[in-house]
Amino acid sequence: MDIERTMFWAGLLEILFVYLAFQTALARTKESSVGEGTGDLLKKSRVVGNFAEHVPLMLIMMMFLENDGYEGFITILGLLFFICRLGHIYGILYQDGFGPKENPARAIGAMGSWALRAIAGLKCMF
């Protein structure tokens, strides 16, 4: 099984995840040892939780697709997914509001991630 591209994206996403988790841990030492807290800690907790919800299954689908011969597709899919995750993270941490007008980075990051996951899921099925 040749999954070098997926391994690259898995490594890059894991490094980002460790960084986000570390930032959350630092915020937790200032606010609350248990729970999501408020303000900065709440935002950082949501970023880590959301990342953990979206990334693992996407990487599994990417591995299946790459193993099936879609190497070029995986490169593009991984890049777009990484950009969407960065946008979502930026939107939660640095922009206020929820809707597309108030927080475009979060909206584009979330909707882009959903769309890419749906595309990967359909490609796995067919």
Regions found by a protein language model. Name each.
Residues D2-Y19, E71-L79:
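Alpha-helical transmembrane segments
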Residues A10, L41-V55:
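A loop-to-helix transmembrane entry motif
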Residues L13-K30, F82-I92:
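Transmembrane alpha-helical segments that form the membrane-embedded catalytic/substrate-channel core
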Residues F22-R46:
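Cytosolic, membrane-interface loops and tails of multi-pass inner-membrane proteins
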Residues G49-M62, S113-R117:
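Core segments of transmembrane alpha-helices
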Residues M62-C84:
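Short alpha-helical packing/oligomerization segments
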Residues I89-A115:
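Interfacial loop-to-transmembrane junctions
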Residues I119-F126:
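Juxtamembrane boundary at the C-terminal end of a transmembrane helix
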